[in-house]
Amino acid sequence: MPLSASLPSKNYDYDYDSVQPYFYFEEEEENFYLAAQQRGSELQPPAPSEDIWKKFELLPMPPLSPSRRSSLAAASCFPSTADQLEMVTELLGGDMVNQSFICDPDDESFVKSIIIQDCMWSGFSAAAKLEKVVSEKLATYQASRQEGGPAAASRPGPPPSGPPPPPAGPAASAGLYLHDLGAAAADCIDPSVVFPYPLSERAPRAAPPGANPAALLGVDTPPTTSSDSEEEQEEDEEIDVVTLAEANESESSTESSTEASEEHCKPHHSPLVLKRCHVNIHQHNYAAPPSTKVEYPAAKRLKLDSGRVLKQISNNRKCSSPRTLDSEENDKRRTHNVLERQRRNELKLRFFALRDQIPEVANNEKAPKVVILKKATEYVLSLQSDEHKLIAEKEQLRRRREQLKHNLEQLRNSRA
């Protein structure tokens, strides 16, 4: 992450990235400490944090966007202290370093800068040295602007379509500097081109044809960007329910929702309309059918209503207090115990009845259940074997009877 610092100022540009990071050139890294020792009393000795530059190799960063600050008031001839610091820092850190006469990348003074000397901008002595360097650079800059002022005034006037020439003297430096800022701002994209219809409720006002983009911006108001407009939209909106409906909405919508939509709807050029309506809490029914439902008969409607009432009652019972829940659990436990006792009594009586049917354990009142079941199984098997024997004997007797009947019939026929 590149190192950056911001001076303590109330200007809004210092809240962002007005001060760019600084980097060493490869051929000048070796002479850094040597140059610092030669300066002696002019600058402070190297801080412990300066070893960071030897450990990390920072990559160059792309140029930052030009500042969109507005022009200063006409009454102020000299810029404020914060504006002076901003002017010097922009000249030190921007792309103008390679093109201006203040410092040259090949010059040794660029490496000896107090800003590069203290990479973290820490310490009160570094701040004092920085203020001293800034004041010297600003004085040199203003002197060069004052020298260039009369020369600019002696030149022929620009065509009527161009901006008027700035005045000479101390105001010339500020005027030319702000003129450069206006030219840099003119190269930027106007937010009104990207957002022809702003997100706020106000109607877009047409700008004059010859207006300068830098002059259109207020002194105290920062430029309108997409991030600012998004934040304003988030702060202004208080949406309870957002519904996206067609422009030709059905006539079955209620009057309350229509009034709410008329009050809160914003103009939009698409066939879809964004509406905000306040829905009553008691009308929230997620299981309800859509608006295009078929009307049910009266009897079926009554059944549905009664079913809903029963569901609500059951839900209310479920959502009762903890005391009622405890009482219900106790009742259920008591009922379960009673039913379990009855079941055990019935089972015991059935075992007693089974014991009485088995001859071997009929008189044994203390016979366990396992013995009763085992003897009962044996007794059932013996009864089944006896049954099979009796069935076979019965079949033999039936055949003997048939044989005897046949013999009797033959005797009767022989006598006749």
UniProtKB/Swiss-Prot annotation:
Entry superkingdom: Viruses
Gene Ontology MF term list: DNA binding; DNA-binding transcription factor activity; protein dimerization activity
SMART domains tied to this protein: HLH (SM00353)
Other observations noted: This protein is synthesized as a Gag-vMyc chimeric protein. The sequence shown here corresponds to the Myc homolog fragment of the chimera.
Role of this protein: Transforms avian and murine macrophages and fibroblasts as well as murine B-lymphoid cells.
Compositional bias segments (type: Low complexity): 212-227, 245-259
SUPFAM superfamilies: HLH, helix-loop-helix DNA-binding domain
Organism of origin: Avian myelocytomatosis virus 29 (Avian myelocytomatosis virus MC29)
Annotated protein name in UniProt: Viral myc transforming protein
InterPro entries, A to Z: bHLH_dom, HLH_DNA-bd_sf, Myc-LZ, Myc_transcription_factors, Tscrpt_reg_Myc, Tscrpt_reg_Myc_N
Region (Leucine-zipper): 383-411
Domain bHLH: 331-383
Start-end of Polar residues biased regions: 314-324
Stretches the record annotates as Disordered: 144-174, 203-267, 314-336
Name of the coding gene: MYC
Subunit structure: Efficient DNA binding requires dimerization with another bHLH protein.
A Pfam family hit: Myc_N
Record field: compositional bias (Pro residues): 156-169
